[in-house]
Amino acid sequence: MPEQVRGDDNAASIGTLWQFGKFRMADFGDMLQWVEVKLMCPNNPVGTVDLLMGSHHGLAVSNSAALVHALRPKATIINNGERKGIAPDVARIYRGSPGGLDVWQMHYSTMAGEEFNAPEQFIANMKQQDCQAFAIKVSARRDGSFTVTNLRNSFTKTYQP
């Protein structure tokens, strides 16, 4: 786990918890691992969430197992870039989550390679798309169910409460 870095603004990141009826989503911005662990241990004050926005582009300085595993999300969306994010250690943490979650990515990650990227249908932007950009859309319902859609290929998955 990374040591506390003095003067790093990421250590001052705030986390947000969004709720719409029974649907719950968390976003911890660029929060660093040591802050995540301090937040979640020894007791998890957040509880579980349905959807987690992956922290810090999926970099290994964030996305601790203490946070991801305690939240038990059904899905996560990682706002990575083609050359930034989805560190192999982070991919292992998400794949090992007790919630059995799906990982959705904004971009195919050259850093992660074939082994650690999500399956193609879960990736909004593949390699070298000639400046085309696609989004990932989330539609949440008050009953706690939600649907995630990859706007590049119209792949959709609905998660139940």
Write out the residue ranges for each language-model feature.
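Core dinuclear metal-dependent hydrolase active-site scaffold
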Residues: 1-51, 124-161
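Cap/insert and terminal regions of metallo-dependent hydrolase folds
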Residues: 7-11, 29, 33-129
